[in-house]
């Protein structure tokens, strides 16, 4: 079981543009071979964590608050937020705040032998990293630059560096990069 940050990024390191839009990314959804990438990944996930900005983006773009059947995920989801957010009835969405470590322990128990997916914002992922809880970073790198926006991972990770586990190109414009997060004792 791993705690994984699975996301897409521009080559200049942004996961959303300065308007919090992902429209730049949608042009890559039809790349040959990509149709199985996300379903393969999501089949390994037993729990999800996201921040409030990601939760609100999903709510705005899917309408699941009015129609809970539009919520795409079938596993328990933890939303980290310091403020009250709208909720949808009948979904296993848990709202939490504060330290990620005790919530991570709960997620591990619920996920059993499956992975934990950290969705969206790099700051929340950074909190997991800072506590030694992040195991892998999986990035779909798109061949565009955004110039500004939401950063991929607003942390300085240089010693030890991430370990490249694999790189899979999809066409000429997109590559999936998979990294292991090394612990200081592993170098």
Which functions belong to the PLM regions below?
Residues 1-187:
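Enzymes that bind and transform nitrogen-containing heteroaromatic metabolites
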